[in-house]
């Protein structure tokens, strides 16, 4: 049996869409802007804290060695740039599956880290997650695809429950 978390990474790398959200944006070029770049402030207040940038690295992966390698790279980028990072679902760590693939604050002490678990988890598991991770915030995710089994053949992907 393959590791579902590793499957997520493999599918994300293999099945890519030519579309991205930037396709929906139109940037209007003004060769002589009327604003002072020193007056632009991207900072924001979120989760009880002030942030330099109005975005963060959202939950990606965790729970496997391959996911841990991805998270380590994301943690390094987040730490170096001051961007918050949200780990993948901490549910795997609560089961004892590679909890080290979620928290990189020993290696990157300046890392601002949040974590998430599925909305189907109990309040007790949410409390255990917060106690284990001491995150900036706990994010709940709704993942309708998790109970589905993914099968592939050549270039086709199908989902069954």
Annotate the PLM regions.
Residues 47-58, 145-149:
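N-terminal small/glycine-rich loop or linker at the start of catalytic domains
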Residues 1-47, 51:
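An N-cap/entry alpha-helix motif that binds or orients negatively charged groups
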Residues 60-62, 90-92, 116-120, 143-145:
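Active-site beta-loop-alpha junctions enriched in small/polar residues
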Residues 75-80, 107-108, 113, 120-161:
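Alpha/beta enzyme core
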Residues 30-47, 66-75, 83, 87-108:
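Glycine-rich, positively charged N-terminal anion/phosphate-binding segment
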Residues 16, 35, 89-97, 120-126, ...:
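Low-complexity, flexible helical/coil segments
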């Amino acid at each position: 049996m393959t590791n579902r978390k590793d499957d997520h990474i493999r599918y994300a790398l293999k099945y890519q869409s030519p579309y991205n959200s930037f396709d929906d944006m139109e940037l209007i070029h003004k060769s002589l802007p009327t604003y002072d770049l020193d007056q632009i402030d991207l900072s924001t207040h979120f989760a009880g804290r002030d942030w330099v940038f109005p975005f963060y690295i959202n939950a990606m992966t965790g729970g496997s060695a391959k996911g841990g390698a991805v998270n380590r790279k994301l943690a390094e980028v987040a730490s170096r740039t001051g961007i918050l990072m949200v780990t993948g679902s901490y549910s795997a760590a609560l089961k004892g599956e590679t909890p080290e693939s979620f928290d990189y604050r020993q290696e990157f002490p300046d890392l601002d880290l949040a974590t998430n678990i599925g909305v189907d988890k109990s309040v007790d598991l949410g409390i255990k997650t917060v106690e284990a991770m001491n995150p900036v915030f706990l994010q709940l995710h709704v993942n309708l695809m998790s109970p589905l089994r993914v099968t592939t053949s050549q270039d086709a992907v199908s989902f069954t429950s």
